[in-house]
Amino acid sequence: ILLYKGVGMMWILGLLVFLPLLTAGLLFFIQGDRLRDAVVKVSAAAIAMLSLFVAFTYFGNKVVFRLGDSFLAQGAILVDILVALAVFYYTCVRFHRYWIALLEAIQLGAVLWFEYVSHGTLDYYADIVVDNFTLIMILIAGVIGSLIAVFSLGYMEAFQKEHRDVRDRRNFFFFVLFLFLSAMFGLVVSNNLLYMYTFWEITSVCSFLLIGYTESRVAVNNSFKALWMNLLGGAAFAAAIIVMGLTYHSTALSHLVGLALAGMPVTVILALLLLCGFTKSAMMPFSGWLLGAMVAPTPTSALLHSSTMVKAGVFLIIKLCPALGNNHAGTMAMFVGGITFFFASCAAISQSDGKKVLAYSTISNLGLIVCCA
């Protein structure tokens, strides 16, 4: 195990998170097709190459960073608030879905309260962990996500020509797409659940924005379905953080696994995190949001299915895998995954619509992964 406190590898990981974030900021203000194409292609190539470099350089070496109670923790709180403000804007100001805003307000209030009461009392075992599994996820997000971004250039241009009734918001589309990739990188390297929660919420909001891109009634309704289901998972995530932090004075995912292996009573925490993973990975009965996402442009479907959204859910569950033996949480994961695999497989073979076949087959494969975990 290589233990770092902020050198070398930390800068590379920071670049992996901030490069797509900076690209997103640029693309938000770019209206011209040529400049947008150039920025997307260069950034996608850089992200893919950086992902490959990280994977091949550090494969086989587990890297751990202890950041402690640093400015990054304060930054995570600020991001949580910004994400909540985005949710409040869409739910209260634009579309008047107040009960969804209430769900966001409850979990934000709970996390902020926990940050206040636990300040200075948490043991920071390892905030960032990069192992072989993390590197595989970095490759999936970095390489496949970059290919989707490049593919989106031509597709979205043709999409806007064929759908004159849809407002051309390609600058916003690519802004959200690269923000999505940035959040995914941050999520998979986070071992501190507080950091992971922040990136988790960003992916939820990004999926909501991408699904509702066309602004049609069906798209808006389906985007809100995805939002409230994932916010429900976010509330479970926040509850798990609070229970673990107040009980064991730690929010490290690896510490949670260690506690479970030592026979400590962590079933409630595991169950809450599994519920969070179920919503994100579209396990039944939460599979409706992924089916609804099919109304979005094809690059959105590709992004949600292959490199980001649903992979985040199974990533968390597989990370918890060593802790799921001989407890009710593991049994719950097995049954939910098995039931999802069976019924989604049956639904997939009965469909004639290509996108629905893709959605159900994705859900069934995810169910099999969860069941085996």
PLM-predicted stretches and their roles:
Residues 147-196, 206-373:
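Hydrophobic transmembrane alpha-helices and their helix-loop junctions in integral membrane proteins
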Residues 9-19, 68-81, 132-143, 194-206, ...:
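Structural signature of hydrophobic alpha-helical transmembrane segments
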Residues 18, 22, 26, 55, ...:
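Hydrophobic membrane-targeting signal helices
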Residues 129, 199, 303:
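Generic enzyme active-site microenvironment
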Residues 3-15, 25-175, 250-261, 288, ...:
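Transmembrane helix-loop-helix hairpins at membrane boundaries of multipass inner-membrane proteins
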